[in-house]
Design a protein with these regions (language model features):
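Class I SAM-dependent methyltransferase Rossmann-like catalytic core
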Residues: 7-40
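Local beta-strand N-terminus motif with an aromatic residue
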Residues: 42, 148-150
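Conserved class I S-adenosyl-L-methionine
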Residues: 42-51
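Residues at the starts of beta-strands that form the adenosine-phosphate
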Residues: 44, 80-82
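Conserved SAM-binding loop of SAM-dependent methyltransferases across substrates and taxa
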Residues: 52-71
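Conserved acidic E/D residue at the C-terminus of a beta-strand in Rossmann-like folds
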Residues: 84-89
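S-adenosyl-L-methionine
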Residues: 94-147
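C-terminal substrate-binding/active-site "lid" region of AdoMet-derived donor-dependent transferases
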Residues: 128, 133, 151, 157-178
Length: 178
């Protein structure tokens, strides 16, 4: 870039933040999550927040189901090979639902149409609010699924989508950005 174009560029003010509508796809992170679920033989996943990781988890659980479904029958597991997704933004929950449905329909046309090998995915919308936990400010989802996961993935909520304030404190303030 030349000097003139650099000088015409508007800079952010000190307290200004760049907000992004969608997040960058991190293939290395997704692969690491996929491998973790496979290598550790996870059967029930609780995911806070949704996205491409939801699709990756569903595929890893499907692979584990195909390999270990007979072994898991011997365990005390009420939700084997289920993915529970808790999301506080309906928009992202719907995007994830469509993405998984589209992927599954493409898989069905390519391979067999055996629905028994698919894992059950439970989508739950829940508001997220500020709360006081043992004298500390925290955020909590108002609704949680009834499950006993062997893997919990925390990828939400967006700190700017938290409802309520405690003593006028909220994580939604830009200065609270980690």
């Amino acid at each position: 870039a030349n000097l003139i174009s650099l000088s015409n560029r508007s800079l952010l003010n000190i307290n200004e933040m760049i907000t992004v509508e969608s997040y960058k796809l991190e293939l290395n992170d997704l692969y690491r999550l996929y491998q973790f679920v496979l290598l550790n033989k996870r059967t029930t996943i609780l995911e806070f927040g949704s996205g491409f990781s939801s699709l990756i988890f569903s595929q890893a659980l499907k692979e584990n189901k195909n390999k270990y479904k007979n072994d898991v029958k011997k365990l005390r597991r009420n939700n084997p090979f289920e993915l529970f997704i808790v999301e506080n933004e309906k928009r992202f929950l719907n995007i994830t639902k469509r993405r998984i449905a589209k992927f599954r329909s493409k898989q069905d046309t390519k391979k067999n149409k055996n629905k028994k090998s698919e894992v059950k995915i439970n989508f739950l919308f829940s508001e997220c609010v500020m709360t006081n936990y043992r004298g500390n400010y925290a955020t909590e989802y108002k609704k949680l699924p009834s499950c006993n996961p062997d893997f919990i993935y925390l990828d939400g909520p967006d700190q700017f989508k938290i409802k309520n304030k405690i003593n006028n404190f909220t994580t939604s303030h830009k200065d609270m950005m980690p």
